[in-house]
Amino acid sequence: MSLPKDLLYTEEHEWVKADDGSYIIGITDFAQDQLGDIVFVELPEVGDTVTKGDSIGSIESVKTVSDFYAPVTGKVVAVNETLEDEPELINSNPYDTGWILKLTEVEEADVTALLSSDDYEKGLD
């Protein structure tokens, strides 16, 4: 299982990457593996404000449909529109081309509450 050390994580298997004043969000390699082949992704709208812990979309695989939760509170400034035609990018590259959305105006307290890669990995055992 791939687990980049430079990202932050949630217990719900989302990852967060700081990116020059904004934050890129996706699901972990563990999560995509549990879901199986992803066939559809429902994304929030650019301009939406999302609240930490709220369902902000869904990820559908051949096995199940899973809600996607906001790991932090912030404003959606971009979504990965490529996922509309190629949702399987989440399976093949969850930490790069399979990113889901980008947020700004993120509350710093939410970021500091996220898990390091080591702490996230311990929770998987």
Curated annotation (Swiss-Prot):
One of its GO terms (cellular component) is cytosol. Residues 22-104 form the Lipoyl-binding domain. It comes from the Bacteria. Keywords: Lipoyl. InterPro entries: 2-oxoA_DH_lipoyl-BS (IPR003016), Biotin_lipoyl (IPR000089), GCV_H (IPR002930), GCV_H/Fam206 (IPR033753), GCV_H_sub (IPR017453), Single_hybrid_motif (IPR011053). Pfam families: GCV_H. Coiled coil: none annotated. Its cofactor is (R)-lipoate. The modification N6-lipoyllysine is found at K63. PROSITE patterns: BIOTINYL_LIPOYL, LIPOYL. Binds 1 lipoyl cofactor covalently. PANTHER family: GLYCINE CLEAVAGE SYSTEM H PROTEIN (PTHR11715), GLYCINE CLEAVAGE SYSTEM H PROTEIN-RELATED (PTHR11715:SF3). NCBIfam families: gcvH (TIGR00527), PRK01202.1 (NF002270). The glycine cleavage system catalyzes the degradation of glycine. The H protein shuttles the methylamine group of glycine from the P protein to the T protein. Is also involved in protein lipoylation via its role as an octanoyl/lipoyl carrier protein intermediate. The glycine cleavage system is composed of four proteins: P, T, L and H. This is Glycine cleavage system H protein. It comes from Listeria welshimeri serovar 6b (strain ATCC 35897 / DSM 20650 / CCUG 15529 / CIP 8149 / NCTC 11857 / SLCC 5334 / V8). The gene is gcvH.
